[in-house]
């Protein structure tokens, strides 16, 4: 990604995190996390269908792709957060 694309990507992610931060004042983090994961899975199912998957079809390649991407991002964020002494703001 170019610097501009990376910046736009992070800005979009920050918008989702801003919603999570707002919800965090009233709900446990675990509930917010579960809702965000469900919403992401739901949206990615829509993306897969828009790219040609039939409604109700489960494509293991698509599942593996999204799981792999999530795992990479989670590991990267865990390493970044756990190496910091500062508790991050969600």
Q: Residue spans of the language-model regions?
A:
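Solvent-exposed interaction surfaces and binding hotspots enriched for charged
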Residues: 1-90
């Amino acid at each position: 990604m170019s610097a501009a694309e990376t910046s736009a990507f992070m800005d979009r992610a920050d918008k989702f995190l801003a919603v999570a931060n707002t919800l965090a004042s009233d709900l446990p983090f675990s509930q917010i996390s579960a809702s965000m994961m469900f919403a992401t899975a739901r949206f990615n199912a829509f993306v897969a269908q828009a790219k040609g998957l039939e409604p109700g079809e489960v494509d293991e390649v698509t599942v593996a792709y999204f799981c792999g991407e999530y795992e990479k991002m989670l590991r990267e964020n865990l390493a970044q957060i756990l190496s910091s002494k500062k508790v991050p703001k969600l």
